[in-house]
Protein backbone atom coordinates (compact mmCIF):
# COMPACT_ATOMS: atom_id res chain seq x y z
CA UNK A 1 0.00 0.00 0.00
CA UNK A 2 1.26 3.49 -0.74
CA UNK A 3 0.53 6.76 0.98
CA UNK A 4 1.13 10.39 0.10
CA UNK A 5 3.26 11.84 2.84
CA UNK A 6 4.84 15.06 3.94
CA UNK A 7 8.04 16.82 4.79
CA UNK A 8 9.35 16.58 8.35
CA UNK A 9 8.63 20.22 9.12
CA UNK A 10 4.96 19.92 8.15
CA UNK A 11 3.94 17.16 10.57
CA UNK A 12 1.78 18.31 13.49
CA UNK A 13 2.13 15.01 15.34
CA UNK A 14 4.16 14.61 18.52
CA UNK A 15 4.29 11.01 19.72
CA UNK A 16 4.30 10.71 23.51
CA UNK A 17 6.73 8.01 24.62
CA UNK A 18 5.89 6.24 27.88
CA UNK A 19 8.21 3.31 28.46
CA UNK A 20 9.95 1.93 31.56
CA UNK A 21 12.49 0.03 29.47
CA UNK A 22 14.85 1.94 27.21
CA UNK A 23 15.36 -1.01 24.86
CA UNK A 24 11.61 -1.27 24.28
CA UNK A 25 11.40 2.46 23.74
CA UNK A 26 14.14 2.43 21.13
CA UNK A 27 12.66 -0.66 19.48
CA UNK A 28 9.41 1.25 19.01
CA UNK A 29 11.18 4.37 17.78
CA UNK A 30 13.01 2.31 15.18
CA UNK A 31 9.61 1.39 13.71
CA UNK A 32 8.68 4.98 12.92
CA UNK A 33 10.16 7.74 10.80
CA UNK A 34 11.23 11.22 11.95
CA UNK A 35 9.64 12.45 8.72
CA UNK A 36 6.21 11.87 10.21
CA UNK A 37 6.44 13.03 13.82
CA UNK A 38 8.42 14.46 16.68
CA UNK A 39 8.80 12.77 20.08
CA UNK A 40 7.77 13.85 23.57
CA UNK A 41 9.80 12.81 26.60
CA UNK A 42 8.23 13.45 29.98
CA UNK A 43 9.22 13.22 33.61
CA UNK A 44 9.15 9.43 33.97
CA UNK A 45 11.40 8.56 31.06
CA UNK A 46 13.77 11.48 31.59
CA UNK A 47 14.13 10.60 35.28
CA UNK A 48 14.83 6.95 34.45
CA UNK A 49 17.14 7.39 31.49
CA UNK A 50 18.37 10.99 31.55
CA UNK A 51 20.08 12.90 28.72
CA UNK A 52 21.37 9.64 27.25
CA UNK A 53 17.87 8.90 25.96
CA UNK A 54 17.59 12.33 24.34
CA UNK A 55 20.90 11.79 22.55
CA UNK A 56 19.87 8.35 21.27
CA UNK A 57 16.63 9.73 19.87
CA UNK A 58 18.35 12.71 18.26
CA UNK A 59 20.86 10.35 16.64
CA UNK A 60 17.87 8.72 14.96
CA UNK A 61 16.85 12.07 13.51
CA UNK A 62 13.99 13.03 15.84
CA UNK A 63 13.17 16.47 17.20
CA UNK A 64 12.49 16.24 20.94
CA UNK A 65 9.82 17.94 23.01
CA UNK A 66 11.24 17.81 26.56
CA UNK A 67 8.05 17.99 28.57
CA UNK A 68 9.26 18.42 32.15
CA UNK A 69 6.81 21.20 33.04
CA UNK A 70 9.25 23.27 35.08
CA UNK A 71 7.69 25.06 38.05
CA UNK A 72 10.01 26.60 40.65
CA UNK A 73 11.56 29.90 41.65
CA UNK A 74 12.68 32.01 38.65
CA UNK A 75 16.43 31.38 38.95
CA UNK A 76 15.96 27.62 39.19
CA UNK A 77 13.66 27.46 36.18
CA UNK A 78 15.99 29.70 34.17
CA UNK A 79 18.88 27.36 34.90
CA UNK A 80 16.85 24.27 34.04
CA UNK A 81 15.65 25.77 30.76
CA UNK A 82 19.22 26.70 29.83
CA UNK A 83 20.40 23.16 30.61
CA UNK A 84 17.62 21.71 28.47
CA UNK A 85 18.57 24.00 25.59
CA UNK A 86 22.15 22.75 25.85
CA UNK A 87 20.79 19.28 25.05
CA UNK A 88 19.58 20.57 21.69
CA UNK A 89 15.92 19.81 22.25
CA UNK A 90 13.28 21.33 19.98
CA UNK A 91 10.73 22.33 22.60
CA UNK A 92 10.64 22.86 26.39
CA UNK A 93 7.65 23.18 28.71
CA UNK A 94 7.06 25.00 31.99
CA UNK A 95 3.96 25.69 34.10
CA UNK A 96 2.30 29.05 33.43
CA UNK A 97 0.98 29.05 36.97
CA UNK A 98 4.59 29.63 38.08
CA UNK A 99 3.90 33.26 37.29
CA UNK A 100 5.18 36.22 35.33
CA UNK A 101 8.66 36.46 36.90
CA UNK A 102 9.35 32.77 36.42
CA UNK A 103 8.30 32.78 32.76
CA UNK A 104 10.21 35.98 32.02
CA UNK A 105 13.36 34.49 33.59
CA UNK A 106 12.99 31.37 31.45
CA UNK A 107 12.67 33.45 28.28
CA UNK A 108 15.69 35.51 29.21
CA UNK A 109 17.72 32.34 29.79
CA UNK A 110 17.22 31.42 26.13
CA UNK A 111 18.01 34.85 24.71
CA UNK A 112 21.60 33.97 23.73
CA UNK A 113 20.95 30.62 22.05
CA UNK A 114 20.57 32.01 18.52
CA UNK A 115 18.88 30.18 15.65
CA UNK A 116 18.81 26.83 17.43
CA UNK A 117 16.85 28.14 20.38
CA UNK A 118 14.13 25.72 21.54
CA UNK A 119 10.49 26.70 21.52
CA UNK A 120 9.40 27.61 25.05
CA UNK A 121 5.79 26.84 25.86
CA UNK A 122 3.68 27.08 28.99
CA UNK A 123 1.31 24.47 30.32
CA UNK A 124 -2.01 26.13 31.14
CA UNK A 125 -4.47 23.69 32.74
CA UNK A 126 -3.78 19.96 32.64
CA UNK A 127 -6.30 18.11 30.48
CA UNK A 128 -6.96 15.74 33.38
CA UNK A 129 -8.45 18.60 35.42
CA UNK A 130 -12.14 19.48 35.37
CA UNK A 131 -13.91 22.63 36.56
CA UNK A 132 -14.70 20.80 39.80
CA UNK A 133 -11.03 19.95 40.33
CA UNK A 134 -10.12 23.64 40.07
CA UNK A 135 -12.82 24.56 42.58
CA UNK A 136 -11.42 22.01 45.04
CA UNK A 137 -7.96 23.61 44.95
CA UNK A 138 -9.38 27.10 45.37
CA UNK A 139 -9.44 28.43 41.81
CA UNK A 140 -12.89 30.03 41.24
CA UNK A 141 -12.84 29.69 37.47
CA UNK A 142 -13.70 27.21 34.77
CA UNK A 143 -10.80 25.26 33.30
CA UNK A 144 -11.36 26.99 29.97
CA UNK A 145 -11.37 30.53 31.36
CA UNK A 146 -8.32 29.88 33.54
CA UNK A 147 -6.40 28.38 30.61
CA UNK A 148 -7.11 31.46 28.50
CA UNK A 149 -5.94 33.81 31.27
CA UNK A 150 -2.71 31.84 31.65
CA UNK A 151 -2.16 31.82 27.88
CA UNK A 152 -2.41 35.61 27.73
CA UNK A 153 0.09 35.88 30.58
CA UNK A 154 2.48 33.50 28.81
CA UNK A 155 2.30 35.51 25.58
CA UNK A 156 2.94 38.75 27.46
CA UNK A 157 6.03 37.15 29.02
CA UNK A 158 7.41 36.33 25.57
CA UNK A 159 6.78 32.60 25.38
CA UNK A 160 6.25 30.92 22.01
CA UNK A 161 2.98 29.24 22.91
CA UNK A 162 1.05 27.10 25.32
CA UNK A 163 -0.08 23.60 26.04
CA UNK A 164 -3.85 23.61 26.35
CA UNK A 165 -6.95 21.56 25.72
CA UNK A 166 -8.25 21.72 22.17
CA UNK A 167 -11.42 23.26 23.59
CA UNK A 168 -9.48 26.46 24.35
CA UNK A 169 -7.27 26.45 21.25
CA UNK A 170 -9.46 28.48 18.92
CA UNK A 171 -10.18 31.18 21.50
CA UNK A 172 -6.49 31.44 22.46
CA UNK A 173 -5.51 31.75 18.79
CA UNK A 174 -7.98 34.57 18.33
CA UNK A 175 -6.64 36.43 21.35
CA UNK A 176 -2.91 35.70 21.13
CA UNK A 177 -2.50 35.66 17.36
CA UNK A 178 -1.93 33.21 14.54
CA UNK A 179 1.79 32.78 15.28
CA UNK A 180 1.21 31.78 18.91
CA UNK A 181 1.87 28.02 19.06
CA UNK A 182 -0.81 25.70 20.43
CA UNK A 183 0.20 22.23 21.62
CA UNK A 184 -2.63 19.93 22.65
CA UNK A 185 -2.43 16.62 24.54
CA UNK A 186 -5.34 14.25 24.96
CA UNK A 187 -5.75 13.86 21.20
CA UNK A 188 -7.49 10.65 20.24
CA UNK A 189 -8.70 8.95 17.11
CA UNK A 190 -12.47 8.68 16.74
CA UNK A 191 -12.50 5.04 17.87
CA UNK A 192 -10.19 5.41 20.89
CA UNK A 193 -11.04 5.21 24.58
CA UNK A 194 -10.71 8.35 26.72
CA UNK A 195 -7.90 7.06 28.95
CA UNK A 196 -7.09 9.29 31.94
CA UNK A 197 -7.89 12.64 30.32
CA UNK A 198 -11.32 14.24 30.43
CA UNK A 199 -11.02 17.21 28.02
CA UNK A 200 -10.06 15.65 24.72
CA UNK A 201 -10.68 16.00 20.98
CA UNK A 202 -10.09 13.95 17.87
CA UNK A 203 -7.32 14.84 15.45
CA UNK A 204 -9.78 16.41 13.03
CA UNK A 205 -11.46 18.52 15.70
CA UNK A 206 -8.04 19.69 16.89
CA UNK A 207 -7.01 20.63 13.36
CA UNK A 208 -10.20 22.63 12.88
CA UNK A 209 -9.59 24.42 16.20
CA UNK A 210 -6.18 25.66 15.03
CA UNK A 211 -3.96 23.34 17.04
CA UNK A 212 -0.36 23.41 15.75
CA UNK A 213 0.92 20.25 17.39
CA UNK A 214 -1.11 17.24 18.52
CA UNK A 215 0.33 15.01 21.22
CA UNK A 216 -0.74 11.41 20.59
CA UNK A 217 0.41 8.46 22.67
CA UNK A 218 -1.18 5.04 22.86
CA UNK A 219 -3.10 5.21 19.56
CA UNK A 220 0.33 5.17 17.89
CA UNK A 221 2.61 3.42 20.39
CA UNK A 222 0.19 0.50 20.71
CA UNK A 223 -0.54 0.21 17.00
CA UNK A 224 0.53 -2.98 15.23
CA UNK A 225 2.12 -0.89 12.48
CA UNK A 226 2.83 2.49 14.08
CA UNK A 227 4.48 4.04 11.05
CA UNK A 228 1.45 3.18 8.92
CA UNK A 229 -0.81 4.63 11.62
CA UNK A 230 1.15 7.88 11.50
CA UNK A 231 0.83 8.16 7.75
CA UNK A 232 -2.87 7.31 7.87
CA UNK A 233 -3.45 10.13 10.35
CA UNK A 234 -1.45 12.59 8.26
CA UNK A 235 -3.29 11.63 5.10
CA UNK A 236 -6.63 11.96 6.88
CA UNK A 237 -5.62 15.50 7.84
CA UNK A 238 -4.69 16.13 4.18
CA UNK A 239 -1.16 17.13 5.14
CA UNK A 240 0.77 16.48 1.96
CA UNK A 241 3.27 19.32 1.71
CA UNK A 242 5.54 17.11 -0.38
CA UNK A 243 3.99 14.11 -2.11
CA UNK A 244 6.32 11.18 -1.62
CA UNK A 245 5.33 7.57 -2.15
CA UNK A 246 5.80 5.53 0.99
CA UNK A 247 5.53 1.80 0.68
CA UNK A 248 4.22 0.35 3.95
CA UNK A 249 4.91 -3.24 4.74
UniProtKB/Swiss-Prot annotation:
The active site is at 69 (proton donor). Pathway: Pyrimidine metabolism; UMP biosynthesis via de novo pathway; UMP from orotate: step 2/2. Its EC number is 4.1.1.23. Keywords: Decarboxylase, Lyase, Pyrimidine biosynthesis. Substrate binds at residues 18, 40, 67-76, 127, 188, 197, 217-218. One of its GO terms (cellular component) is cytosol. It is an enzyme of class 4 (lyase). CDD domains: OMP_decarboxylase_like (cd04725). Disulfide bonds: none annotated. InterPro entries: Aldolase_TIM (IPR013785), OMPdecase (IPR014732), OMPdecase_AS (IPR018089), OMPdecase_bac (IPR047596), OMPdeCOase_dom (IPR001754), RibuloseP-bd_barrel (IPR011060). It catalyses: orotidine 5'-phosphate + H(+) = UMP + CO2. Catalyzes the decarboxylation of orotidine 5'-monophosphate (OMP) to uridine 5'-monophosphate (UMP). Belongs to the OMP decarboxylase family. Type 1 subfamily. This is Orotidine 5'-phosphate decarboxylase. It comes from Baumannia cicadellinicola subsp. Homalodisca coagulata. The lineage of its organism: Bacteria, Pseudomonadati, Pseudomonadota, Gammaproteobacteria, Candidatus Palibaumannia.
Amino acid sequence: MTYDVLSAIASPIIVALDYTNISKALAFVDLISPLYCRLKIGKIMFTRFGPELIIKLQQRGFDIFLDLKYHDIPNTVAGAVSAAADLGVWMISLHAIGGEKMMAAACNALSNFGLGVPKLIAVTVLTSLSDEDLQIIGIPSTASDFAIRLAILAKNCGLDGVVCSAQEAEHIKNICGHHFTIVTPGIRLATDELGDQCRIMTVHQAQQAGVNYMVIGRPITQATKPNCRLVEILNSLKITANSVALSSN
